[in-house]
Structures are given as structure tokens and as C-alpha cells.
Amino acid sequence: MMNNFSKIGFILAALGSSIGLGHIWRFPYIAGTNGGGAFVLLYLFLALTIGIAMLVGEMLIGNKGKANAFKSYENLDPSPSKKWRYAGLTLIGGPIILSFYAIVLGWVFYYLFMVSFNLPSDMESSGVVFGELYENGFVPQTLGLLFVMGLTGWIISRGVKRGIELLNLILTPLLFIIFFGLLIYAMSMDSFGKAVEFMLSFDMQEAKKAFTLDVFVDSLGQVFFSLSLGVGIIITYAANSDSHQNLLKSSLWIVLSGIAIAIMAGLMIFTFVFEYEGVVNKGAGLIFVTLPVMFSHLGILGNIIAFLFLVAFSFAGITSTISLLEPAVMYMSETYGWSRAKATWSITLAIIALGMVIVCSICTPAADYLAVGGKSLMDIIEFLSANFIMSIGGLLAVIFIGWVVSKEKLESYTAHFFGKLGFNVWYYLMRYITPLITIIILLAKIAEFFMGEDAVKSILESMGL
């Protein structure tokens, strides 16, 4: 079962896991509203330092542990008690995230098949279309969840080589081709320059926004989420990679390619938004409300562009769903001796069950009973998994590499891709800087959870941060 990825297959699979829905619809917005080019530089700096350091660290755990996340920690733990194996249990974050992620991806498929060639022509009607799906669409949301999880389960059940690698060898390059083609078209539009200015300008007054603590924490959180850190994905994929894989080069490819996709998507999206004076917002509102109206102004060409955009978006989503499911499947297969099919479909059914509860919490009369503090169950699970499970998982990984595995072992593990200076920089980051920054993120998110985002921002502003 081990060493099933080819070298390029491993990079594309890890890249596919990182280029998800949130990376495409969230990064452009926070870049444009938090300093533009200055924020992009800040994000690049953090991704190329902290991000790559953590990627290499998690890859090492899997590449040298050669097992599921739980067992990989155990195999590398030098202590007799082997208690660090429990750090691998953060892989539970994958199925939890997938329970709501599959629902959102189901919305993408709904728009792909039902809306892309019948686009709403104004913001009001577009809001009604999405509102009807979100608040009253129990049947389409259920069908979307079943379709996404059925497709994900089928791919995973085929194995690493015939399932995960084959899918990513096809979809990840196609994703780049579609986005690049759409970007070329966007460059011919009058508003392309405005989109470039919105995302990449270096206005010093606006740049100050990128250097406040809350934006710094937000950008670090985006690094975590966009690189699939903390939930066993990277460890699991690396366990199936070649023992002599250049993990530094692989990490660079993943980070830079992810940034390229995010910037291409952002420039393309905001060109259309500015061309037709749409509303600059983020998340579902941008993708499912604003963009359909913008595309509708182009007639049949807009229908084609909308279709291609949603195809690319669905590609990004499905390469992420398989990465969220694989760590748990590998764990159950290796720990309990289950066949790959049994592990895949058992976990898939459990995710569907949780997903159905979430669907009920947003579009049935049960919504009021499943809400906590005015937040839907979907919002709560999304916030907890993205901000706590991933942060805790990432923190455990960096502490394990920086403080548990011996420096001598790490030097031998990384000798084929790190020189002495490179190793010392990486080791210093993993031992001191990255754990401290991860703790700051975790504390900030805990404060936000209990006090609210606005209250935390007010406190930071009063402190001059």
C-alpha cells in the first residue's frame, strides 16, 4: 500500500487538497480589502516561511513514519510510552470538515447543472435563487450531499494510484487550464486594470491594514486552511510518497501553485464584478449571488463562462473532498484490518449522517432547535473545525518535530534536500517561531469564539494592534 504515489502524483495530490473552495473565494477578498499587494506580499512571506516549514514537517512525519497519521507519530516517537501517537487522532477533523464542505460543493454542482444556463439577470432575483436553495432546498441539498459523498467514496475506494493520483493527474492541470483561459478573457475587459489595482496595488495607507494583528492572524489562519495542515492530510499523502521525495521542492510547488491559482481566480472574478458594478463580497455571496448576475450580462458567452467557472470550481472541490476522507480511511484500514471498501463506505455513511443533520439545521423547521447562540450548526462546525482542530493539529505536529524527534534524526531525514544553513533555519522555525505563532492563532480564535469577532477587533484596535 505504501509508496503508491509517483513523485509528480504526490505533488498534484497535495496541491489538489490545498486548492479548495475557501482558497479560491476567500483569498481574493481578504487580499483586496486588507492592503492589496501588501497583503499578498505578507501572505507570500508567511506561506513561504511558516507554511513551507510546517509542510515539510508534516510531510516528514508521513514520509518517514510510512503509515496512517496515528501510526506515523507512533513510529517516530522515541519515547517508550508512544503517547504522541494520539496526536494523529486530529485526522478526525477531515470527516468533520467534509460533513459541511460536501454540502457547499453540492451547491456548486446544483448551480453547474441547474443555473449556469439559466442565469439570473439582477441581484434581487439572484438572491432569491440562492436563498431558495439555502433556506428551502432540502431535496437539492440532500441530493448534492449524496452525489458529492458518493463520488468521493467511489474515488477513494479505488485506492491511491487508481483513485487519488489518477484524479489529480487529470483534474489539477485542467483546473489551471480553465482558470488561465478565463483569465486571458478577463484581460481583454476594461475592468481588468481595476481588478489588478484592487488585489495587487501598493497604496501605503491601504497597506497599513495588512500589518494589524487581526489581519496577521487571519492570514496565518488562511495559510493553515489553504495548505491542508493539521488534519492528517499531508501526513497521509506523504506516507504514500517515495522515500527519497524532495519534500522542500514539493512544498514550494504546492505553495506557489496555490498562490497562482488564488491570484488568477481573484483577478478573473473581480474583473467581472467591476465590469458590471457588482457587489464586492466574499464566500457564498460572491460565488452564488454576485457572479451569476455578472455573467448574465454576456449573453450565451456568459453561460459558457459560468459553466467553465463552475466546472473548475467543482474540480477544486472534489480534489479537496478526497483528501479530507483519505486519512480516516487509511487509519481504519491499517488499525482495524478493514478492507479499503469497508473503511471508505462506513466513514462515508457516517459523514452523510452528520451532513444530513447539518442540512436539517439550515433548511427545515428543525433549524431553530439546532442553532446555538444565533449560529447555525453548519457555522459552528465550520468555525470549530477550521479554527480549533486544524490549529491544534498543526501545533502538535510542530512541537513533535521541533521538540520530540531528535535533531540528529531530522538532519539525516532531510540531508538530501536541506543544506546545513537551510536545515538550521527550518529547525529554528519549527522549534521556536512556528509553535509560538500557532499558539497566537489558537488564542485569537478562542477569544473570537467566546467574545465575537467585532469585540476582539475592538480590543486589538484599542491596544494599537
Predicted features and spans:
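Membrane-embedded translocation segments of transport machinery
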Residues: 4, 8, 165, 169-318, ...
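Extracellular loop-to-transmembrane helix junctions
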Residues: 31-57, 140-141, 389-391
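Transmembrane helix-boundary motif of multi-pass solute transporters/channels
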Residues: 6-46, 232-238, 248-252, 256-259, ...
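Helix-loop-helix connectors at the membrane interface of multi-pass transporters/channels
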Residues: 105-136, 238-244, 249, 253-260, ...
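Membrane-interface "cap" regions at the ends of multi-pass membrane proteins
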Residues: 1-25, 54-59, 63-88, 242-246, ...
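Loop-to-transmembrane helix boundary motifs in multi-pass membrane proteins
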Residues: 9-11, 17, 142-143, 257-263, ...
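C-terminal membrane-solvent junction of multi-pass transporters and transport-like membrane proteins
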Residues: 86-93, 336-348, 382-438
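Inter-helical loop and helix-membrane interface segments of multi-pass membrane transporters/permeases
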Residues: 30-34, 67-89, 102-161, 190-217, ...
